[in-house]
Amino acid sequence: MADKNKHHLAMAIRAINTLAVSAATLALAPSALAQEQKVLEEVVVQGIRYSLEEAADRKRADGRVVDVIVAEDIGKLPDNNIAEALQRITGVTINRDFGVGSEVSIRGLKENRVEVNGRSTMGDGRNGINFEDFPAGFLSAVEVVKSPTPEMVEGALGGTISLKTARPLDLKDTVMAATYDMEYADKADNWAPKINIAAGDSWDFGDAGVFGAMAMFSYQDRTLRQDSYETSLFVYDHTQIANLDQPAQNTPSGDYVVAAEHKFEPYTEERERTAYNVTLQWAPASEKGNFYLDVNATERDGNQEAYSILYASGSPVATADTYEDENGALNNYRMEGVVAIPKTWSSFRSTEAFTNAFGGEWNFTDKLKVSGEFSRAESKTFEPASEFNWRSVDAAAEALNPSAANELKSDLTVVNSNSKPGSVVFDDGDIFAQTENFAFREYRYIDERVNNEETAFKFDVEYAEPFDLEWVTAVKTGIRHTENDYERTQSELRLKDIYKNLKDANGDPAIIWMDEIAAAFPGSIITPGVGSDAFDHTGIAGPNALTNFTVYDAGRLKNVNETFRMVQQLLAGSNYNTPGNSDGYISTNGSVADDLVESKGSYALIGEETSAFYLQANLDFDRWHVIVGGRYVETDITSTAYNQEGTSLVVEKQSYDDLLPSVNVAYDLMDDTIVRFAAAKVMRRADYNELSPTYIFNSDRITATKGNPALEPYRATQYDIAIEHYFGTGNMVSAALFYKDIASFLKETSRCDYVPDAMATQNQSIYENICIKDFDNRFANTSDYTFASSQAEFDTAVAESRNGILTTLPSNGESGKVQGLELGYQQAFDFLPGLWSGFGVNANYTYADSEDPDGVALEDISKNTYNAQLYWEHSGFGMRLAYTYRDEFLDDVYQKRTERVGTQVGYNDGVSDPTAGNSYRDELSQLDFSANWDVNDNIGLVFNVTNLTAEPTVNRSVTGTVWQVQENDRRFTLGLRAKL
């Protein structure tokens, strides 16, 4: 078995080099038996076909329910990262960030474990490293394990994604390989480089043993763009809509759903990633074992810029063209008395992550093997963010009465669309694109840092055929101990409501106009050209004033010190220089760091210790192959946070233990047909933000999320039954049924919380989004709340301290379930003549059904998902079309912009509605293309297109009304591969 594994690893490394997206390469040393088999076959299979054959062989030989991708399969696809390769596997779906794969769900569950060579990876949460941070080129294979065994580390609810890197002692000759790609993103209109380099060798020192070393380097720098059109959905009784005299006909309550706020946001993101991987390995001359040192480090820096203009407030008015659609939403209507809030955003993300390990294994006898490993994984994330926004103000009214609100308002006509950004047209033309109509409203800077680290030790013992029982292949046992520390800090500078609360040195009302800033600071105010090509793939339903706006330059905003000094000058001598000012404080000559205020409500420190022991037996009875045993794990968690007043730290502790039995059975029904059965208990600890009793506020201090340190983990019992039939070379068909009973399901509840510090800095101009409590509960946290229907009603509530923070927090609920079917088929058509023999297909389908305790489908689970890949390879040329589809799914249980809309339509209908705030994502499909040409044995060329059809992402309320449309880049890649 060891020789076979080494042979598989060697072939995988050769695959990486052949396509050279990765940095590993060929020249590996297969076993003597494997070499003999190659000679007998007299066929060298490479490229996509080799990769699929190898994946089928590994799946067939494994005792678990598992799917495998070898590195060449990753390299051959037009896939930018591991996530986009994993989406080709049955039961796996992904989410994308700016069109790039970032999150993986296994059978609809995102609570998975991501490991490298069996050890933990670290990100800014529980799920491990972000797939955008880890180069696919570092890998020899990726396994998706759906049925665990006792020796595997606990913590996966959906499955374990096991990333495998190469070992240098598998190298036969010196390895040197390099790849160079240039990627073009069409919306960003940017060419970006990606470089991979690998070098490795091994040396035989005779009696001193064999030493090997491998080093890999990867660099990528890219710019991406995303266009986003959003609305906020409100619920109106027909009496609140002018010129409308009848209730809605298509909602249970008779209320109408109205998109009352609109904005267009073009985002541009720059991403730079540098990664290193070094492995040193030594084996003594006795060949009884080996020792290794793995060092992996990733640095990723990214800057995001965005502009928008939000049209808010106003009252809906029906016209002769107004109608109600089948979802109860109002269409073709007017909004009267709308105000404008232009915004500029800039955020930066810097992440440093590493995973280091020292370990080895030793065969004391032919039967007894021991192994151990000490590892450390750490991630440090620094994420500052800035915002600069304005408010439309009537200059003439301001001159007459500067103490009044003096908002500049306009009327607009809205024409909605089912899958495109709607049309928004102002009566007053470009009134909200003129600098003289805007006043400085707010400046905000946030400094957020997350440190996450794990120290782990494990020790394993394996004994083959104890008591000479041939049917007991091996008995394994081991221990593992970990110590985890997670810390999150946040500090903030916020200067709000400047347009209405600014006072000069004499205490008189003052205002700072946009055109004044433009004159005093040339180049600071711009009219970005991003609106001219907005949604150029998807199109817009009609004329849209949202794409024409004037804002503060994002290039200046990301220069924190430059913008801070400008704001200091603008507010010099004002009430904002007074410490304790309720709208914010800025010094006259200090630095950003000096003026930052620690957000004690956001501080979190979580310590976690786990201790695990397992016992496993591998059994063989002729046609039966069984892996059975159990894993016992103890967990101790300490959560530290500030009390609600922010005056002292409070420590809360939680302990629990789990016994996790499992069995995997494989039965050779026929020589080429395997029937599998697996059953297991699994657990997944709650994420750190679910455990931390701290508040994470949104930008307006209107909503927040909060953890619960008393949470028990997710616990589930799962069953799998599968049949696999293999035919020819690497061809297979498979079917699997799966069922998961999630016994301690986490559910989210909402309440209106009393958080004085946050309430003092609330953006109260969006009063209709702020929760209101009754008088008796004004200083309490309560689930009994409502919303103001008018500014006057809200002002009264604030005067009585009845406003609060709408807070979402998790709790352990009842059971939920996930069940489904997986079908897979792959075949190379090598029986066809000539060029036709180069064709092959790989396709799969997954059906998943899910339900939470409220009867609502679980997040991120599509009922139907399928992938189809058609490839052709012949005489050094290769091409592949890859299509991925998933149908509608619940994207978010609670989305702020749909929080008022549920199946019962409104909050105030007297019905408890668990679907209120649900957001569903429309069906998604993507078509990718790749082609390659091996010029000779050392040089290769590749061409890829990702997102050929440029499909938009559309999000809807549970009633079917569109609230968001997003569009991403179509990406083209040209690349060169070279090896020695």
What are these regions (language model features)?
Residues 36-38, 152, 168-174, 204-211, ...:
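Short loop/turn motifs that connect adjacent beta-strands in outer-membrane beta-barrel proteins
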Residues 44-75, 102-103, 112, 119-121:
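N-terminal periplasmic "start-of-domain" segments of outer-membrane beta-barrel proteins
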Residues 83-120:
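Extracytoplasmic beta-strand/coil segments of soluble accessory domains associated
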Residues 119-147:
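Short acidic/polar hinge/loop motifs at secondary-structure boundaries
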Residues 188-318, 323, 333, 341, ...:
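Transmembrane beta-barrel wall of Gram-negative outer-membrane proteins
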Residues 338-355, 606-609, 683-742, 752-755, ...:
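Outer-membrane beta-barrel signature, preferentially recognizing the C-terminal barrel domain
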Residues 739-741, 751, 758-894:
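Gram-negative outer-membrane beta-barrel transporters
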Residues 741-744, 839, 887-903, 932-980:
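C-terminal beta-signal and adjacent terminal beta-strands/loops
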